[in-house]
């Protein structure tokens, strides 16, 4: 009743991203007095992990004379709009008077890093890569070889090192270092400040330890995880458990620091390599898309029931001028 009295009109953008609880609240509010208007695109519903479902968007009923379809695409070239129309049948988008024909969409096949560099050169050094997962995005940042990438490495880390005290601190320091190199110092300190909770000034201790680690970055970034472990023990003075023969020692001896570093989730990522989910709502002049499901999407697109295909659609629709699609083979 209070919300109805305060807000006679409510407008909800990106309605396809609402979860069942949010939908329930809005439905209750609109039962009387308050007029609720929503805008969204079921083809861009990509947050099932938060409870969002295309069916929730479909279930928002309005009178026929209150439902409108926006067909004009003010962002992309005619070539990109043609691709967007080819993969969906529910609406037919069209450009506006200022829409240009644009360049052909390019399929790039082969090595992932070579593909990015080729597209980068074609665009004069202005290119945004959009990847399905954090690991791929971070690997591209570091020009990391695709054959060395393991998206399940964090799970293996937890399985191999059963010492929670040691493993949690090692991982926290890795996150802090990588966040720092993305200029997110506030979040970086949050990751390790808890480790120094017994200190008189935990924040000061965290800053001191992180500063030293960053100075020694070149000494461990291209080495194994065991070298990072020794660096932490030496610089911070933390008493971390040593290693006996077994799975933990084998993992630390054989896993490069960079392999774990690329698994760090950079929340406020403003780099040229981000995930598709982080690009939602944004737009870029030139885009290259990395997604393992891209081939199946191009051959048989299914935006109705396949969320992976909707994720790819979101990526394609971010591009203004040039679009590159990467296929491994």
Q: Where in the sequence are the language-model features?
A:
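The feature marks helicase ATPase cores and/or their adjacent C-terminal helical subdomains
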Residues: 1-329
């Amino acid at each position: 009743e209070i919300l109805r009295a305060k807000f006679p009109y409510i407008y909800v953008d990106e309605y396809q991203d609402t979860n069942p609880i949010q939908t329930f609240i809005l439905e209750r509010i609109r039962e009387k007095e308050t007029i609720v208007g929503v805008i969204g695109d079921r083809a861009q519903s990509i947050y099932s992990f938060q409870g969002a479902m295309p069916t929730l968007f479909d279930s928002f009923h309005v009178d026929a004379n209150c439902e409108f379809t926006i067909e004009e695409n003010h962002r992309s070239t005619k070539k990109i709009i043609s691709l967007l129309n080819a993969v969906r049948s529910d609406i037919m988008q069209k450009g506006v008077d200022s829409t240009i024909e644009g360049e052909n969409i390019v399929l790039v096949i082969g090595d992932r890093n070579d593909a990015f560099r080729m597209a980068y050169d074609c665009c004069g050094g202005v290119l945004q890569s959009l990847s399905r997962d954090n690991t791929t995005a971070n690997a591209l940042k570091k020009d990391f070889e695709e054959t060395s990438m393991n998206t399940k490495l964090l799970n293996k880390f937890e399985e191999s090192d059963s010492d929670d005290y040691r493993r949690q601190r090692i991982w926290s320091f890795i996150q802090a270092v990588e966040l720092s190199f993305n200029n997110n110092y506030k979040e970086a300190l949050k990751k390790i400040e808890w480790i120094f909770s017994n200190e008189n000034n935990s924040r000061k201790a965290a800053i001191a330890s992180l500063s030293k680690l960053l100075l020694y970055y070149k000494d461990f970034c291209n080495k194994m995880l065991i070298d990072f472990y020794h660096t932490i023990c030496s610089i911070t003075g933390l008493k971390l458990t040593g290693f006996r023969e077994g799975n933990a020692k084998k993992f630390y001896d054989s896993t490069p620091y960079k392999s774990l570093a690329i698994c760090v989730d950079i929340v406020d990522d403003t780099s040229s390599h981000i995930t598709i989910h982080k690009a939602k709502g944004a737009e870029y002049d030139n885009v290259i898309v990395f997604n393992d499901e891209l081939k199946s999407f191009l051959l048989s697109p299914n935006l109705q029931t396949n969320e992976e295909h909707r994720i790819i659609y979101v990526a394609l629709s971010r591009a203004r001028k040039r679009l590159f699609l990467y296929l491994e083979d």
